[in-house]
A protein has these predicted regions:
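C-terminal tail/sorting-segment detector
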Residues: 2, 517-531
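Residue-level detector of functionally pivotal "anchor" positions at catalytic/ligand-binding pockets or at interdomain
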Residues: 478-504
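Bacterial Sec-dependent N-terminal signal peptides
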Residues: 1-25
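Structural signature of tandem-repeat unit edges
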Residues: 31-39, 57-65, 81-97, 107-120, ...
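Consensus positions within tandem repeat domains that build extended binding/scaffold surfaces
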Residues: 101-102, 122-125, 145-148, 168-170, ...
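Short, T/G/N/S-enriched strand-turn elements that build extracellular solenoid repeat scaffolds
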Residues: 43-52, 68-78, 99-102, 124, ...
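A recurrent domain-boundary module in secreted/ectodomain proteins
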Residues: 462-484
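Terminal processing/anchoring signals of secreted or surface-associated proteins
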Residues: 59, 277, 460, 484-488, ...
Length: 531
């Protein structure tokens, strides 16, 4: 297959986190500020302590290094302050492997210079090191792990001839990318129409298209990889050929302008209905395009599972940006998703950053981590049978005021309500206090009114998992749910109150004299006279 050099020109990007105080991020102002020489691997920390350098914003290391040395370098950068490590020059070091997760999430590292002895970059090594603008790949490198450079600001991806393996998502979400190349002598990878393809298994690793318009996945592609379109934020449509037999997790993340996905006739594994991507028998909804037009969407009754990120960004702040007219955008925006009874699993990140309201059917038994992160839901009732609330489930949901957990709940994950600012009513129907992650309610900026089953207040008060300043008080005013529900089979559940409004439709958080409109967990509403 013919090799081409792809030049992608885009507007110079101002990084979200600038370690250089406004200076040109292509220049390394801290290069070789301090040089350390070691003669034995594993001694870098001691050499640093002996040298006592006045500055370490830029560090050049000469000599043999091992993983312990690399972890020490990460430690120097970990505070992520302006006086910490920005530039790491390893060109004169002897190193064969960059460890997995090495600089992951460290905001102030801008330049890394890798040695020619390097053979492998581990998975997530530079993931979300979002100020990183330079990390050129040396000749001799053989393997790059999954998501190794995801979410960085690197400007060039020039693959060496020696490179044999690239993990999925390695180059996803590269916001400042201007250049990609594969040398003709490298037989393992090709670039076709701005798409990087791994020849060994015909996997589409990354779509580097920055412009607007349609993407036709090449006929040679058999698999679309994890995060393959991650960051292709301007494309409006994707056409999948009949050759594709598998699609990786969250393949269409952050395709903000995407309006439709089509599948070629004759594809035995996938289908598209009105621009929405499903597996062939429509039991799995894979992707609802972020900017698909329509105020509401009813998921087909055949669907049993929502894939990872199925509705992420839909109706949210990043959708419909190509529509400038406010009235037209309002007509296009997705506000409501209706999930069918029979649905059993909602994947992680399914509604992350979405702007729509959603029901959770009584048949759901599994909900993935961060499912509703930064979404606009106002209330949520988790159905009977669900045993676990995943990490970050309701984090950054600024409008969420009422959460109802079922009697079957056994575990509450980390930071489930982090960054929320609304006083929240939490109804927990579990007779025995669920086990909580030690940070279950960490970073919650308001307070919780906890309601438990009658007679169980003392049990919750004694539980270390349910103590803390976030709880205003514990009220044991809920009626116990007696049900034969299991984790695999649906059952009828007594409806409970999930929200309350006055006659003007304004949300209220306690009964008010007069007529109150009460919304129940089964979707019904009733008017209640409060005297």
């Amino acid at each position: 297959m013919r090799k081409i050099l792809l030049q992608l020109f885009c507007i110079a990007c101002t990084l979200n986190v600038m370690a250089q105080n406004g200076k040109n991020n292509d220049k390394d102002h801290y290069l070789n500020q301090t040089t350390l020489q070691v003669t034995k691997a594993g001694t870098l920390e001691q050499a640093f302590a002996d040298a006592k350098p006045d500055n370490c914003q830029g560090l050049c290391v000469v000599g043999p290094l091992n993983e312990a040395d690399m972890r020490f370098l990460a430690k120097l950068a970990k505070p992520s302050g302006k006086e910490d490590l920005h530039s790491i020059n390893l060109q004169k070091a002897q190193l064969e492997r960059v460890p997995a997760h090495w600089l992951q999430g460290l905001a102030y590292v801008t330049h890394v210079y890798l040695p020619t002895t390097l053979k492998e970059v581990g998975a997530y090594a530079f993931a979300n090191t979002n100020s990183l603008c330079k990390a050129d790949l040396p000749e001799g490198l053989k393997s790059i792990g999954e998501c190794a450079f995801v979410g960085t600001g690197i400007q060039r991806v020039n693959l060496p001839v020696s490179l044999e393996m690239i993990g999925e998502g390695a180059f996803a979400h590269l916001k400042s990318l201007t250049e990609v190349s594969v040398p003709a002598a490298n037989e393992h990878f090709d670039i076709v129409d701005s798409m990087l393809i791994r020849n060994a298994d015909n996997t589409l690793l990354q779509c580097f298209m920055k412009g607007k318009g349609q993407v036709q996945v090449p006929e040679v592609v058999e698999r679309i990889g994890h995060l393959a379109f991650g960051g292709a934020k301007n494309i409006s449509s994707i056409n999948i050929p009949k050759s594709v037999t598998a699609i990786g997790e969250d393949a269409f993340a952050s395709t903000y302008a995407l309006e439709t996905i089509s599948v070629a006739e004759g594809n035995a594994h996938f289908a598209s209905t009105n621009g929405v991507l499903f597996n062939k028998d429509a039991t799995l909804l894979i992707c609802y395009p972020t900017s698909k037009r329509g105020n509401s969407y009813a998921v087909p009754a055949t669907v049993k599972e929502l894939a990872t990120g199925a509705f992420q960004e839909c109706g949210g702040g990043n959708a419909y940006k190509h529509i400038k007219d406010k009235a037209e955008k309002k007509r296009a925006k997705l506000n409501q998703v209706t999930l069918p009874e029979g649905l059993t699993k909602i994947g992680k990140w399914a509604f992350t950053f979405s702007g729509c309201q959603v029901n959770i059917p009584s048949t759901v038994r599994e909900i993935g981590d961060s499912c509703f992160f930064y979404s606009e839901i106002e209330e949520v009732t988790i159905p009977e049978g669900v045993k676990r609330i995943g990490d970050g489930m309701f984090a950054a949901c600024y409008s969420l005021a009422t959460i109802t957990l079922p009697s079957t709940i056994e575990y509450v994950g980390a930071k489930i309500m982090a960054f929320n600012y609304v006083e929240t009513t939490l109804n927990v129907y579990a007779v025995n206090p669920p086990t909580c992650h030690r940070d279950a309610f960490a970073d919650f900026a308001s307070s919780i009114n906890l309601h438990v089953v009658k007679g169980k207040k003392q049990a919750y008060e004694k539980s270390n998992d349910w103590k803390g300043s976030v709880f205003n008080d514990i009220e044991d005013d809920l009626k116990a749910i007696v049900t034969g529900v299991s984790a695999t089979a649906p059952s009828s559940v007594e409806a409970v109150e999930t929200a309350r409004y006055n006659l003007q439709g304004v949300r209220i958080y306690a009964p008010q004299r007069g007529i109150n409109i009460v919304k129940m967990s089964d979707g019904t509403q009733k008017k209640v006279l409060v005297k």
